[in-house]
């Protein structure tokens, strides 16, 4: 196990629906522990992209990344849950720890709050055992498969998953005379606390039950069915725990578990549909196939093996969520707590304050088949709870983070043509923007959010987020011919100007008297007790992605704007003892470890200096992303941190939250080919590309000279090739006024 195992590759003939069981390599660990490993076909290596994924990236530091078995956008994230020791265990796992409390079926990835961990199994030596030691050297993980060798008890644990079901296999050592596990419905991760649980059905080879809980998501409901490959005896222990005793320890015990947020009957149907048989290796192979299919939507060429591994790991991480939140029969539990029948796939785990910036614009490039269902999810959430999602989890609105982040995502889908019910989408956006809660009433009354009237603080961050969301509403209103609405929301989108102090050149808290808050220190950050959200004035002054040219004018002219922007990457200062740990990945005061900074590097293109963006983009990719468990500069944030890398590595980034204007940066890949579907591809080719040749010298789009430092979404969707000639010195490319975004 100390040697890195060869990665699984699914042969092309499997894609032709011939699905043989791949060669099982017997790997003897301690004398008698088989390990599922698959033969690596060198001839197929180029199409086996899972071999380039390192799931451990981000499992240390502040990455908070999930480690375990799942499939793209699945409801199930089956993996180890460790004994929580603090904030860095939000996913239930951290590289620094070695104490397991169970193998749970649901985990979050990259969040700043811990949740889930539902329906856990743990092999034990006796009924009172609640923790098991393990060694990271005895783990084996790849997309869709997790395994670990435990010593006490002496058992080899293997896990895989489908969208709505988990599959376990436990192989007990020859010295194990009493094979047993604990089924734990009490334990949860972080804020999660059970409110009701029970085994509602107990049979010789199956149990079924429910687990309801509260926490970050206030009203969580999970129903489950667990089937065993051999007879077991189930005995109640203390609260929420049952002892599962295995009849024959000489045979592996397999457990199939189906989950549903609706009912036991639906959990059973999910399980029977997705894992009808007991062929563990086939499910592992199907998971690998699912990952390869999604990873292949972007094929990159590079001589840098580390960059390739970081790229495909980022792709892998970007597909943990949104998570499917409807059953195979179409039923789902809505935001109103009721069961609904849908004609679309419903989703949850919507970390929108993070993901509207890059993860969702990335989805519009590579997951177009999902977009109508994502839009339907948003519209139905609005109809069920009266507003678009803010941070939705397990069908619950958590209201976590500031602003109206559901608006940019839905507006982008409307403007890019993926929403059939445009009027319904617009109504959801408009009414979400016109509410009274979360500071919106103050915005309507004063035209901004005065710090002395909002008890929840963070008024600058809220106000800037509302302004960019209002701009998105205005764009959709304009598209639909709603002139009065377009005018109203376009004016409200300019409210960001209220927070700008021309004397200091920063966005600042402002009171009802029209005066800025004093005293003022642009470096200071007091978590949840000042005018900013997980940041300071240096970081929030640039949060005007919808109107960069308007922001430039506030500084007086382009030169003053550039001078200030240059300073961002140089200045250092004391943020104070109460700064948020999310302020990380610093280059000067630029904080790549947190989302509000993510568009800032690309602002140089707006003022005709794309070479400065290129230098900083390369620096950020090289310094903030590593092929290591501590390889992220901050929380993964449900795919946003990875999505920034994916887009930037290809040379693209959508700064404006909605509309499809992708800024051209400095691709780290020599070639990236995006599969658009319908047999069309869009390729970005970098000629003469290297670690020194980071500046675009010239460009061609489909063979014709291209001078703009941005490209529109609809132009990419036609298919074709963007060819960039790179060099080691800044050039005049993209600098003319007509060529700027």
Where are these regions (language model features)?
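Single conserved hydrophobic/aromatic residue that forms the stacking wall/gate
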Residues: 1-12
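Bacterial Sec-dependent N-terminal signal peptides
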Residues: 11-44
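Accessory carbohydrate-recognition regions in carbohydrate-active enzymes
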Residues: 39-408, 412-464, 472, 477-498, ...
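ATP-dependent phospho-/nucleotidyl transfer catalytic cores
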Residues: 469
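Extracellular attachment/recognition segments
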Residues: 695
